[in-house]
């Protein structure tokens, strides 16, 4: 089967991408680590002794980076529908985040009555090529991640998620502003310029009295 022009362009860009080359040199699993690294250097969202949950973790670049900062002091819990090779100090769950059994497995690892300090999500759906469908699927995943964050974040905790500009973006932004002290947008240099992706960083979760 002949490659499409877009896939050929992606392969050419990928093999010459400075962040791909840098990830190989520095031993990271993906170029995406530099998106999180830039946000961390600017906003200092990851600190030792934290419990961090990553949604959409495979192939593991973000979890690898977070575990390095925690350095054995704290907990790194990662989840993805795809398999992921084991990483030191990372507890990985393979399963579909949309399924209740998988979500319950995540709750079990966190522990009953326990909260987490940071939720990070780089989840994205498989694309269909139909923009409106892909946007709806993407926003559904983001909303599920936000629901989880609001259920399990400690008061003052932070939530970082990948979002694509389009239908639902403004509503999500406004909703997060009611749940967190501050909501910021971040477009790291490692995010390809033509991509519609951006990151929302919601800081200072406001936990209501239970």
From Swiss-Prot:
**Keyword Methyltransferase included in the entry's annotation:** yes
- Tell me which residues this entry annotates as catalytic: 162
Where, by residue number, does S-adenosyl-L-methionine bind? 60, 62, 80, 96, 122
**Can you supply one Gene Ontology CC term for this chain's record?**
cytoplasm
| NCBIfam families to which the protein is assigned, alphabetical | PRK11188.1 (NF008390)
Task: Give a short account of what the protein does.
Answer: Specifically methylates the uridine in position 2552 of 23S rRNA at the 2'-O position of the ribose in the fully assembled 50S ribosomal subunit.
The protein in question is named Ribosomal RNA large subunit methyltransferase E
